[in-house]
Amino acid sequence: MTNIRKSHPLIKIINESFIDLPAPSNISAWWNFGSLLGVCLILQILTGLFLAMHYTSDTATAFSSVTHICRDVNYGWIIRYMHANGASMFFICLFMHVGRGMYYGSHTFSETWNIGILLLFAVMATAFMGYVLPWGQMSFWGATVITNLLSAIPYIGTNLVEWIWGGFSVDKATLTRFFAFHFILPFIISALAAVHLLFLHETGSNNPSGLTSDSDKIPFHPYYTIKDILGLLLLILILMLLVLFSPDLLGDPDNYTPANPLNTPPHIKPEWYFLFAYAILRSIPNKLGGVTALVLSILILAILPLLNTSKQRGMMFRPLSQCLFWLLVADLLTLTWIGGQPVEHPFITIGQLASILYFLTILILMPISGMIENQLLKW
């Protein structure tokens, strides 16, 4: 009798994806983040489901319902904080995952890479709408400022914003539809993630050397299942340390004040994982220019395959490109810091320089370094 694991139509798919999957023998811990993202997604869907059972998407009661979850619902506080901090862990894993892809040249798998970019946009949209739901001051003003950016689109901008709002300002209709979208998007993300995996398994995984690993494969289970469990335990440890010791560390104190359209907070800023993009947006004095730069800061990932000038796939043996990559990481950290600062001197100038450096590094310096390294190979 054939093993049910290899013959059953459904179990066979799981087997080919997580058990008998041929994996390169030399992939490092940087390849752990894909499975961690899957765990984060499942965690967010489960905690979100329980939160949705007690949450009300009405401007009059939304803030109170979140307070009710924290005070009166059994273990409501831990579910709420696991969901809020789970989003932060999700983005940490996402940034590491994308960074790994850039460093080791994974963008040569164009379908997998492009679906990954779609996933990034979907997760960012979900996180933004989720931040609006508690209906605190930063929720309301964040929603107002970010949705208002669409009014920069010529001709249709104003109509588009009012259509998204469902009125002439962020109000009950906006909150209700954001809740609906926030609920449905994670399931769309799950479907996209399945397609992401499907395309990845068509080509097989990349590895640190950037060379083909067809001649040296090992089964995913037990080698990488045990390796992934270590990463998972570390993820849970960091998440639970955050949740149990300082659950509001990454949040904004303004969000503990109920939304008030008549009172603007002194510094409107999004969650920490959007600050780099927010800093790029603010660094351009023109509204349309800022919005364009904001979108391009993420969309630039889509043209990375076109900017790849090197004959080598990854950056493992390319010291010049490595320096530029870590310069880019430092630049993104600088942008994240600037995004959380008030709009005044010297932060404006630092933000503008960091924004220029971001695009300059990706569009010009990295392709040039690839060409230089190609020449060095001949020596």
UniProtKB/Swiss-Prot annotation:
GO terms for biological process: mitochondrial electron transport, ubiquinol to cytochrome c. Its cofactor is heme b. Disulfide bonds: none annotated. GO terms for cellular component: mitochondrial inner membrane; respiratory chain complex III. The chain crosses the membrane at residues 33-53, 77-98, 113-133, 178-198, 226-246, 288-308, 320-340, 347-367. A ubiquinone binds at residue 201. Binds 2 heme b groups non-covalently. It comes from the Eukaryota. Heme 1 (or BL or b562) is low-potential and absorbs at about 562 nm, and heme 2 (or BH or b566) is high-potential and absorbs at about 566 nm. Belongs to the cytochrome b family. This is Cytochrome b. It comes from Fossa fossana. The lineage of its organism: Eukaryota, Metazoa, Chordata, Craniata, Vertebrata.
